Amino acid sequence: MESDGGLSRYQKLEKLGEGTYGKVYKAKEKATGRMVALKKIRLEDDGVPSTALREISLLKEVPHPNVVSLFDVLHCQNRLYLVFEYLDQDLKKYMDSVPALCPQLIKSYLYQLLKGLAYSHGHRILHRDLKPQNLLIDRQGALKLADFGLARAVSIPVRVYTHEIVTLWYRAPEVLLGSKSYSVPVDMWSVGCIFGEMLNKKPLFSGDCEIDQIFRIFRVLGTPDDSIWPGVTKLPEYVSTFPNWPGQPYNKIFPRCEPLALDLIAKMLQYEPSKRISAKEALLHPYFGDLDTSFF
């Protein structure tokens, strides 16, 4: 048994960034030369952070080609290291590096995102922090979901959850308006925002605080009322004096977009969570009709 918990089997190469609860390094497995991502977790006084334990248990439960693989867990002194497969870059960095994404690549990335999500949701796991930075891609065109730090097993009936989830720009309106009971539709809203960002090459709703985020959504999609979204006026953060914006047609929001893409994104950005398309349903949408899915 190695005194360092097995850490000496890996050579750290460079720091990749900060995750939900610790630093992430690119490293090489000395014996095989395989590149890995090492996620270093600071152990709290009472042991392993609950977010880390959640990620470990969920990822071991969810082996799927569109979910980042967890190879190993190393315990070294007062630190825990998660050893993940390494991918070249994330979707955010890639989008920043190109003038535009070609329509077929958008379709492929969206399909793979939905595949990983449908699988996770099928295992009753919400991701809750979907954003381009958490979607890893490789040079072969594969896309995988990463950073399940906020992920949560869904219990039925829908439980009361914290609403401090998801980077503001990708946060579902029911969460922004203070709903504490929510389920898989929160992830589908985030997918709609990511899809829109790939189509327009800029974030769909880039608010700088919660009320700004709410207003940005309302300006684009219209201010919802009980006729559009039954029960919205009873949510804790809903205010009857919200400005009444009419909303814009989807072909104006996404001017260079094919009609089937507009139809799919409209189904993802439904205000009423129960009317929002599921990942499983979205995979069957005719938008993907011309995509060669044998690759996935």
From Swiss-Prot:
- How's its activity regulated? Phosphorylation at Thr-20 or Tyr-21 inactivates the enzyme, while phosphorylation at Thr-162 activates it.
Keyword annotations for this protein, in alphabetical order, are:
ATP-binding, Cell cycle, Cell division, Kinase, Mitosis, Nucleotide-binding, Phosphoprotein, Serine/threonine-protein kinase, Transferase
Gene Ontology cellular component? cyclin-dependent protein kinase holoenzyme complex; cytoplasm; nuclear periphery; nucleus
Question: InterPro entries, from UniProt?
Answer: CDK (IPR050108), Kinase-like_dom_sf (IPR011009), Prot_kinase_dom (IPR000719), Protein_kinase_ATP_BS (IPR017441), Ser/Thr_kinase_AS (IPR008271)
Which positions carry Phosphotyrosine? Y21
**Residue ranges of every copy of the Protein kinase domain listed in the record:** 10-288
Active site annotated at which positions?
D129 (proton acceptor)
Phosphothreonine modification sites are: T20, T162
- The broad enzyme category this protein falls into is transferase
Q: What is the E.C. number?
A: 2.7.11.22, 2.7.11.23
Known role: Plays a key role in the control of the eukaryotic cell cycle. Required for entry into S-phase and mitosis. p34 is a component of the kinase complex that phosphorylates the repetitive C-terminus of RNA polymerase II.
Task: Spell out the family assignment given in the record's similarity comment.
Answer: Belongs to the protein kinase superfamily. CMGC Ser/Thr protein kinase family. CDC2/CDKX subfamily.
Please give the name of this protein: Cyclin-dependent kinase 1
Report the source organism.
Dictyostelium discoideum (Social amoeba)
